[in-house]
Amino acid sequence: NIKFSEKLRTLFIGEDSGNHVSNFVWAYELDTGRLQRLLSAPAGAECTGLQGVDDLNGWTYILSGFQHAGDYTSATVQAVKDAAGPAITTNYKGLMKGAAIGYISGKSVAVRLTK
């Protein structure tokens, strides 16, 4: 999942990987080569629906969701499952059943990842 913002000169990357416990949304600034993590999905979840709005009445929005919280891989150690499982069950109505959407917002100058 990727989205490019021409105004911010930034590539936003939403992970869907089984290579680690938590997936993230990243921002890669083309002009500086700087990579920053913006948000983390719950253990086992994938980041989905990545969107960006460069200018909506002077504000910039980065939108993302996640799904399949608790969808662990065979490499996920039991200690992680034991630690994350109760929170996922409580907050997202059970393993692999919950999802959420959200956004990060700010004025376009405030959303710049470097000065």
Predicted regions located by residue number:
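Sequence/structural signature of beta-propeller domains
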Residues: 1-115
